[in-house]
Amino acid sequence: MNEIPRKVNSPLFHGIKPEEMKPMLSCIGYHIGTFQKGDIVAFEEENIRHIGIIMSGSVDMVKEDLWGNKTMLIRIRKDELFGETFVCGTDNQSVVTFLVSEDSEILFVPFDRVMHNCTMACSFHHRLIENMVRIIANKNRDLMRKLEVVSKRTIREKVLTYLSIQAQTQASRYFEIPFGRVELAEYLCVDRSALTRELVKMQEEGLIDYDKNIFRIL
């Protein structure tokens, strides 16, 4: 077991004081893994038993079809968690691959120890369960937004829908998106070159302005 982190800013631990981290993690159990960019944290069809919490770096949730085409469903970043969708169900088998998108350090905790009170009836278990329910609800919302984007027929419609969601989320028409061109193309499920051409057209037509991953809706 690795040294217990004193503070992890994950929403799973919302409402838990820094001094409570050590006894809490000692109770539920944990381990910390280090990964390099391109590593696989969990393969599709692998049974998931632990929740992963990203302490540094990021991980992509990726779906691959029979022809090897990969679609990035969502990027999980620092302090966010992954795997909870699968460990919560009756079937723990993952339907996606978790791919490390940059060097990462990940805290793993066993799901069953998070969701069930221990024999000592530690006070933080109820808080963990509340936080987990809230996290799953937020993840479902994010996936619904992704579905709204990719269901659009044209690249322009997908781009405008995605940028509109980002503007609403960040409460500004001037905002930064978390993707470069390659990642954005994967997220939108479109060809990168075609996406680049469409962005140029939209800028020339006065719909948007952008510099790298900084966008402004005009």
Question: Model features per residue range: what roles?
Answer:
Residues D112-T154:
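A small-molecule sensor/coupling module
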Residues R153-I155, Y162-L218:
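Phosphate-/nucleic-acid-contacting segments
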Residues I40-E46:
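Short phosphate-coordinating micro-motif centered on Lys-Gly-acidic
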Residues M1-K37, F86-T90:
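Cyclic nucleotide-binding regulatory module and flanking cytosolic helices
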Residues V59-T71:
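A short beta-strand-loop-beta hairpin characteristic of the jelly-roll/cupin
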Residues M72-E130:
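Cyclic-nucleotide recognition modules
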Residues C27-I28, E46-I48:
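Short, small/polar residue-rich loop motifs at catalytic or cofactor-binding pockets
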Residues G38, R49-V62, K78-D79:
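Glycine- and acidic-residue-biased ligand/ion/polar-headgroup-sensing regions
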